[in-house]
From Swiss-Prot:
Keywords noted in UniProt: Ribonucleoprotein, Ribosomal protein, RNA-binding, rRNA-binding
Keyword Chloroplast on entry: no
Subunit structure: Part of the 30S ribosomal subunit. Interacts with proteins S7 and S18. Binds to IF-3.
Source organism (scientific name): Buchnera aphidicola subsp. Baizongia pistaciae (strain Bp)
Gene3D superfamilies: Ribosomal protein S11 (3.30.420.80)
Protein name (Swiss-Prot/TrEMBL): Small ribosomal subunit protein uS11
A molecular-function term among this protein's GO annotations: rRNA binding
Family to which this protein belongs: Belongs to the universal ribosomal protein uS11 family.
InterPro entries linked: Ribosomal_uS11 (IPR001971), Ribosomal_uS11_bac-type (IPR019981), Ribosomal_uS11_CS (IPR018102), Ribosomal_uS11_sf (IPR036967)
Domain of life (superkingdom): Bacteria
Length: 129
């Protein structure tokens, strides 16, 4: 019985210069995903997945660590320039943008894409504590 050798080609990562960083900063968590201009996600990270649990997950430092993890994943693609899309009112909003800048990405523009209702659904009732 003769065994055939199967050759697997190494997948070469494309070199992409420009990308889009989507930052979803909620009150409980911060989700960062970096994609190319077409919207294909290259890498993502969350503050919960970075080892933070409970109330520490919603801190600016947790968002900073998540951005650093996401940047390590995406650096292999050769991205230099980023457009930043920020969604949500969370505490990791500003620190994640600053971290992207200090890592070495050139930020082209920052856009706030937080959804704002034009008197849509009724908001939940106020908490009584």
């Amino acid at each position: 019985m003769v065994k055939e050798l199967i050759r697997v080609k190494k997948r070469v990562k494309k070199q992409i210069l420009d990308g889009i960083a989507h930052i979803h900063a909620s009150f409980n968590n911060t989700i960062i995903s970096i994609s190319d201009k077409k919207g294909n996600v290259l890498g993502w990270a969350t503050s919960g997945g970075s080892g933070f649990r409970g109330s520490r997950k919603s801190t600016p430092f947790a968002a900073q660590v998540a951005v650093e993890r996401c940047a390590d994943i995406v650096k292999s693609y050769g991205i230099k320039n980023l457009e930043v899309m920020v969604k949500g009112p969370g505490p990791g909003r500003e620190s994640s943008i600053r971290t992207l800048n200090t890592i070495g990405f050139r930020i082209i523009n920052i856009t706030d894409v937080t959804p704002i209702p034009h008197n849509g659904c009724r908001s939940p009732k106020k908490r009584r504590v």
